[in-house]
Amino acid sequence: MTIRNILVTSALPYANGSIHLGHLVEYIQTDIWVRFQKMQGHTVYYVCADDTHGTPVMLRAEKEGISPEALIARVHAEHLRDFTGFHIAFDQYYSTHSDETRYYAEDIYRKLKEAGLIAVRAIEQLYDPIKNLFLPDRFVKGECPKCGAAEQYGDSCEACGAAYTPTELKNPYSAVSGATPVRKTSEHFFFKLSDSRCADFLRRWTHEGNHLQAEAANKMAEWLGEAGENKLSDWDISRDAPYFGFEIPGETGKYFYVWLDAPIGYMGSFKKLCARKGIDFDAYWKKDSTTELYHFIGKDILYFHALFWPAMLENAGYRTPTQIFAHGFLTVNGEKMSKSRGTFITAESYLEQGLNPEWLRYYYAAKLNGSMEDIDLNLDDFVARVNSDLVGKYINIASRCAGFISKRFGGKLVSGEDYRLLQQMVDEHFAGWQPGVIEAAYEARDFSAAVRHIMRRADEVNELIHELAPWEIARDETRERELHRACSLGIQMFYLLSCYLKPILPRTAAQIEDFLNLGELSWQKQQAGQPLSDTLLPPGHVINPYQHLMTRIDPKQITALITANQQTMQQTMNTETESHSPQRHGQAQQHPVAPIAETISIEDFVKIDLRIARIVDAQHVPGADKLLQLTLDIGSEQRTVFAGIKSAYDPEQLKGRLTVMVANLAPRKMKFGLSEGMVLAASGENGGGPFLLAPDSGAQPGMRVK
């Protein structure tokens, strides 16, 4: 096996607030992938850091009467506590306010300047005459210049979705002091992203080497423009004093913008790890590095990671990312996380209420599919799925069999002829087990597919144990060998399932390692043609007495969690600092909502025949910018539908998915062929989406939606 050398990062949480369940989507996703790679025997380093610079940190520290350094030290300890509580195993968790990050920020800036990619220009900004500071976009409020909505921020309107500059706001005021800002001119430093060297490189990088998911590559194509077109703008990388950050070398009162040194924090954190562990930093970051570099991020910061970051690295003489993996936002019960509803749940409150962090790790894994789709934490489904899958299916296998092994057979599994008979049973009943499929799903970050495959296998094990009924056999003393085989089989299959679930459930896996009397659960690879029975525990293996591994979720625990967050947020809510976080990934953003359409009668509605459809095939449509051609199975027949969802979905990701279609819509002759219906998708008034609708589990092709 070829050993891969891999460096993995998660986006840096901002040092201006608590970790919440939206943030945890990314860190759990990354941690699962890293643990899987380490189980494969690869050399993997996982680094992260607090993103510590910027005006919000400076102002919050001032408000609390402490230094910014004291604030970020306190928040760093809180963040690390929360991550540790959810078993996020960083190899290094650091801070961007470090000598290492400063060194690489200055080095990259110097090299870009030497390459002629730094420009100095005078810009006009809004200035707070009371606080004596230039106001970032999110620190200015006023009336939207497009629709007139009040209390809008200086960069975009949450009512109509319009984008604008702070100087365009009507009746602006400072969100810091309440003063009316004045206009002042200041020299700023720009990274010349529009330079042909950057634009040409980004165009090549986007389309070569599979660096981005298909949805991200489509978004990059929009930002870059068509071939021969350059839609990129130069990037302002400086801020004026007063500011908490790194001063630009050779300048007075000019600081690096937080988004310049934030991704450089990956390098700073890894450099710290290298110093601790004796790792060769250059082997991972030099231009011709053969190692692998992966960034896990939220889709709302794709712009910074897929445009600015690779262009900076390339032109400063460093390697660029192997791949950037972007995930979607988290909603709770189908809605944006809400403080008033108690669904803006912090990591700390989840743990303080006594909820098992591995319940959430499993639920997120069951939802994450490697795409940029949003995921929903439906709290009722959360309770049902964890109780059904983890406790009812998986843990139940061990609890049904372990007691007999300990009490009747001294903790020893079968050996000799009975072991050979057990192997035959395994190969006969579980021929459909495909560890390679699970492995491929983990590699592709399609954890939902891995979980589905594992739980199907757990169902098969439970079905066989139910058929063998060891609790019935145990009543007949003449069937001791049969009882021993049945219970040994259950423990053996539980062992294999535990190997596959270890990246998701590391704490439970550690308990199982003790229960099964193992040094460490390792990934059980099954070679082509090799029987599954070759991957079992050896004959006569001795296990320890069974200790309870996991409890069910009591719905009352969820109610208590919601109540606790409602009470806490009412006491500590600080919307001013919360809204200024430059990395708001993991939480769905505010969006304008279209007005409700004209009322129709029930008679009108029932004319629409909505059916569950399985996407059998999905293809690009030559010459079409927005369309995908879908082949849909609606139970009784197959239909061809052209859907305008190309910007959001890669065809390969759609195959096998269920969706909803209008089945009785008149066929429409299009330039590319006949469209025999319409699939349903949601989209925002400000351009968000489209988001293909999907039914709940259990729905089948052809079922009518009513």
Swiss-Prot record:
Coiled coil: none annotated. Binds 1 zinc ion per subunit. It is found in: Cytoplasm. ATP binds at K339. GO terms for biological process: methionyl-tRNA aminoacylation. One of its GO terms (molecular function) is metal ion binding. It comes from Nitrosomonas europaea (strain ATCC 19718 / CIP 103999 / KCTC 2705 / NBRC 14298). Keywords: Aminoacyl-tRNA synthetase, ATP-binding, Cytoplasm, Ligase, Metal-binding, Nucleotide-binding, Protein biosynthesis, RNA-binding, tRNA-binding, Zinc. Homodimer. Is required not only for elongation of protein synthesis but also for the initiation of all mRNA translation through initiator tRNA(fMet) aminoacylation. It is an enzyme of class 6 (ligase). Its EC number is 6.1.1.10. It catalyses: tRNA(Met) + L-methionine + ATP = L-methionyl-tRNA(Met) + AMP + diphosphate. A motif ('KMSKS' region) lies at residues 336-340. This is Methionine--tRNA ligase. Residues 604-706 form the tRNA-binding domain. Belongs to the class-I aminoacyl-tRNA synthetase family. MetG type 1 subfamily. GO terms for cellular component: cytosol. InterPro entries: aa-tRNA-synth_I_CS, Anticodon_Met, Met-tRNA-synth_bsu_C, Met-tRNA_ligase_1, Met-tRNA_synth, Methionyl/Leucyl_tRNA_Synth, MetRS_core, MetRS_Zn. Zn(2+) binds at C144, C147, C157, C160. Residues 570-593 are annotated as: Disordered. Its main location: cytoplasm. A motif ('HIGH' region) lies at residues 13-23.
